[in-house]
């Protein structure tokens, strides 16, 4: 596979007077910042000569200290989380238990002698990265492309953008980490195909199926686990060392486990004082974790329709473990691509995209996907899906909706997220009302509704009614998002309940149709009694009773058959004039239009 040349350029490649933007990989364990010029990437080192800066923050002597592996860790896991989610998730609670303000109504941490929100704390890490880059490049930096996990929701994305804004960055684009890595690999004009991006970082695992055609990058499916990463491998090794050699479960033992893991990537054994572990033992210990990632990758392929893939792109420092490459090859029998340093692939892609956005010289395009379907609640609690699960974004979809009852002067819009067929089983994102509509017969008012997801994954919904020239728009706020765990649960529940959901929807649709049918017929009888004989009215009422009984029985097949029976018998036995009235009513026409 041919890849773009990526090298450490001379300092002269970066001129302060040029408009520049940086790429930032804000990682769970480590963060990086880089800049690209003429499609050559430079990862910017910290003042102590490190490219990988630990994503830790401490506050001592009235100063923030970044990257010293002390204080608050893995703050990235807190993006988009509510206080309730933190309290109910042991893994998250353990991260912040020493800082958490449990008396607050929202998530705040006691930090720097203040009560701070997560974006305010994370902003200090962005400030540190910004200062390091400005010192190296001798220029002010204000623009950035920032990477986020593929499964970050609106809430998390919004807080990342807020943190960067507090730090003084204009965020040009948020892009998914696997997408950024693929961008670093796939810029060659002749590159095309379908690739699986396997991203195992310190704290999260993401997998994407990426289609590359004629310079267009399209993520066609995503999956992952935001509570699985290289840190879990370290924990497994630490537990083994504690049990095998009677060591304390301490930071020192954890560091020893990390050293053993790193050594065993290129040696068959590791020996340190009275501790020893060989490659075979290591692989036995971590195989269950690796198999979990393989299963997630296979599920992602199924979501994408099982396309033929041309290679696997490795991202994340944890992928240096030889067992991962071996197991991936066993599972997929294709090339494993690891030409680029897996720790840097994401930030390289971000830097290249940043350069592309401020000085476009390529037609390459990145496309992410919506992790869950988005839609609206219809009458009767039915969900109308408007943007489907795994639809490429950015996207905008327009649909038309109408009133259900006469003289309706407002339409309630309930925005939902999820794969189930009924609103009660989906996640509520937002509600708004289009008011001031002219009172007219049901079905006359037409509201044009637009669902749009921008390149950063933020959803906005607008509605417009032409007759009254009334409009309303809403942007779904970050606190309406959901996390990766909930996404997995919702997808699993949708799969398990697919059959019952389908029949529930069919029943509800049949009931709604029957109720509208009964209303229209009874209204016609009341207004056109003179056209009917007593025997005809008796036949109509008898047939209507059959429909009502079917509705009461909650049998959608019986309901549909009862309506068909009504139409058939009325057509044969009723006066032609009344038949015209009935047909027009059932087509949604106004009685006053019937001549």
Swiss-Prot record:
Coiled coil: none annotated. PROSITE patterns: HSP70_2. Keywords: ATP-binding, Chaperone, Nucleotide-binding. One of its GO terms (biological process) is iron-sulfur cluster assembly. InterPro entries: ATPase_NBD, Heat_shock_70_CS, HSP70_C_sf, HSP70_peptide-bd_sf, Hsp_70_fam, ISC_FeS_clus_asmbl_HscA. GO terms for molecular function: ATP binding; ATP hydrolysis activity; ATP-dependent protein folding chaperone; unfolded protein binding. Pfam families: HSP70. NCBIfam families: PRK01433.1. Belongs to the heat shock protein 70 family. Chaperone involved in the maturation of iron-sulfur cluster-containing proteins. Has a low intrinsic ATPase activity which is markedly stimulated by HscB. This is Chaperone protein HscA homolog. It comes from Rickettsia rickettsii (strain Sheila Smith). The gene is hscA.
């Amino acid at each position: 596979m041919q890849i773009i040349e990526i090298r450490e350029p001379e300092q002269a490649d970066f001129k302060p007077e040029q408009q520049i933007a940086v790429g930032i990989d804000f990682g769970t364990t480590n963060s990086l910042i880089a800049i690209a010029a003429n499609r050559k990437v430079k990862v910017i080192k910290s003042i102590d000569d490190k490219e990988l800066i630990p994503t830790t923050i401490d506050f001592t002597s009235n100063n923030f200290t970044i990257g010293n592996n002390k204080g608050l860790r893995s703050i990235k896991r807190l993006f988009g989380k509510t206080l309730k989610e933190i309290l109910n998730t042991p893994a998250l609670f353990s991260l912040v238990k020493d800082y958490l303000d449990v008396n607050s109504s929202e998530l705040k941490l006691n930090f720097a002698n203040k009560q701070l929100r997560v974006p305010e704390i994370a902003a200090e890490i962005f400030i540190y990265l910004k200062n390091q880059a400005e010192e190296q490049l001798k220029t002010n930096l204000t623009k950035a492309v920032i990477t986020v996990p593929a499964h970050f929701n609106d809430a998390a994305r919004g807080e990342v953008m807020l943190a960067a804004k507090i730090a003084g960055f204009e965020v040009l684009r948020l892009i998914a980490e696997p997408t950024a890595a693929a961008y670093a690999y796939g810029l060659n004009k002749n590159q095309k195909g379908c690739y699986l991006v396997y991203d195992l970082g310190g704290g999260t695992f993401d997998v994407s199926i990426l289609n590359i055609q004629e310079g267009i990058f399209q993520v066609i499916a995503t999956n992952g686990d935001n509570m699985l990463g290289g840190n879990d491998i370290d924990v497994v090794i630490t537990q083994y060392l504690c049990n095998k050699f009677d060591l304390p479960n301490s930071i020192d033992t954890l560091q020893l486990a990390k050293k053993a893991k790193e050594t065993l990537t290129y040696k068959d054994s590791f020996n340190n004082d009275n501790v020893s572990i060989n490659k075979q033992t290591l692989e036995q210990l971590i195989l269950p974790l690796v198999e979990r990632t393989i299963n997630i990758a296979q599920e992602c392929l199924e979501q994408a329709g099982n396309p033929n893939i041309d290679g696997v792109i490795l991202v994340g420092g944890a992928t240096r473990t030889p067992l991962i490459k071996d197991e991936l090859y066993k599972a997929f029998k294709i090339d494993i691509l690891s030409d680029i340093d897996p720790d840097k692939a994401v930030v390289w892609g971000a830097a290249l995209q940043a350069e592309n956005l401020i000085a476009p010289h390529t037609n390459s395009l990145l496309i992410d996907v919506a992790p869950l379907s988005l839609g609206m609640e219809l009458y009767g609690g039915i969900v109308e899906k408007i943007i489907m699960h795994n639809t490429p974004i950015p996207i905008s979809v327009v649909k038309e909706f109408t009133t259900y009852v006469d003289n309706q002067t407002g339409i309630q819009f309930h925005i939902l997220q999820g794969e189930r067929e009924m609103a009660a089983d989906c996640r509520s994102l937002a509600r708004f009302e289009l008011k001031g509509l002219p009172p007219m017969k049901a079905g006359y008012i037409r509201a044009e509704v637009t669902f749009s997801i921008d390149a950063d994954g933020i959803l906005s919904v607008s509605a417009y009614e032409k007759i009254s020239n009334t409009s309303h728009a809403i942007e779904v706020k970050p606190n309406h998002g959901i996390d990766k765990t909930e996404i997995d649960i919702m997808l699993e529940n949708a799969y398990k309940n697919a059959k019952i959901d389908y029949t529930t929807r069919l029943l509800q649709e049949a009931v709604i149709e029957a109720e509208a049918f009964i209303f229209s017929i009874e209204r016609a009888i009341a207004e056109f009694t003179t056209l009917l004989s007593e025997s005809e009215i008796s036949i109509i009422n008898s047939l209507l009773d059959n429909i009502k009984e079917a509705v009461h029985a909650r049998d959608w097949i019986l309901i549909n058959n009862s309506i068909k029976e009504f139409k058939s018998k009325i057509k044969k036995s009723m006066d032609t004039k009344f038949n015209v009235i009935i047909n027009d009513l059932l087509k949604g026409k106004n009685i006053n239009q019937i001549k």
